Amino acid sequence: MASGSAGKPTGEAASPAPGSAVGGASSQPRKRLVSICDHCKGKMQLVADLLLLSSEARPVLFEGPASPGAGAESFEQCRDTIIARTKGLSILTHDVQSQLNMGRFGEAGDSLVELGDLVVSLTECSAHAAYLAAVATPGAQPAQPGLVDRYRVTRCRHEVEQGCAVLRATPLADMTPQLLLEVSQGLSRNLKFLTDACALASDKSRDRFSREQFKLGVKCMSTSASALLACVREVKAAPSELARSRCALFSGPLVQAVSALVGFATEPQFLGRAAAVSTEGKAVQTAILGGAMSVVSACVLLTQCLRDLAQHPDGSAKMSDHRERLRNSACAVSEGCTLLSQALRERSSPRTLPPVNSNSVN
């Protein structure tokens, strides 16, 4: 399904929450906020690159490799869900500003995690709505699914990379049992999705080499994962610099194995066929994707402003400039939400529509 509950992260590739624990000691809320900013920014940019900047029209699936597909939802349902989520985004944007102004960096970090998940969810829904609107135009031919969903497996790869980056970058003193648990669970969740998706692709593949290569890729990934998770268990049971360094050492092979598997799985022959749409359909799709991009760009800017504020002491000469940038980026988020809502209602770009009550000119 394309929506799910408003404001709730979707799918199994959701963040393993390194941002919720990195540097997570309560005495270091600024450090934690900086880490969350980096994670959220990377996630939002990746999803935008995959769904908004692509020239292809494809449905967006959220429930896993065996999902019946997001196409069960109508454009109208997607539109209403997205508009509801823009309202939730406005509330979170206000909350983050207020918490930061009061010096509540821990609460601001929690709100930012929620904001990042909401932006990802909103982007997914917007991309699916754009697809539905495009294929509803005359002469359009719907997309044909392939053996692999490029978006889902690429998201999983990114989450695995993020989890391994946390293990490499976190000092021993900050490797709390909670952090190690969250990273381990996140890695396991995403690796399971990749395993299931590639097993399904192997079963459905008609090519003998592809069937075997999917299986070998999964085996390689699973072996690397077992070696890394054993190191994580060891650093949890008997913390030491040696145990921590082993986590960093064995994270490399897992990242490489996942990258190789996803690289193979996303070769063109496994991805099906994008929808064929007319010029009219392309214009409708571009309008909605452009509205969503306005929201994502503003939220990325907001995240960068939060990061800058977290890194400077309150008495810093640049503090007032950073706060002004934060206010401006919050306004940009609001404007982006308005543009997206208009694009969904009009099925055209609000930037090219005549102003309300304007007189036409020849």
UniProtKB/Swiss-Prot annotation:
Superkingdom, natural source: Eukaryota
N-acetylalanine modification, residue list: 2
Molecular function per GO: actin binding; identical protein binding
Gene3D superfamilies associated with the record: Alpha-catenin/vinculin-like, Talin, central domain
Lineage: Eukaryota, Metazoa, Chordata, Craniata, Vertebrata
Tissue: Ubiquitous.
InterPro entries (UniProt xref): Talin_IBS2B (IPR054082), TLNRD1 (IPR042799)
Oligomeric and partner information: May homodimerize. Interacts with F-actin.
Biased composition regions of type Low complexity, renumbered to the chain: 9-27
Protein name: Talin rod domain-containing protein 1
Function noted in UniProt: Actin-binding protein which may have an oncogenic function and regulates cell proliferation, migration and invasion in cancer cells.
Region of interest (Disordered), ranges: 1-27
Coiled coil start-end: none
Alphabetic keyword roster: Acetylation
TM helices/strands, residue ranges: none
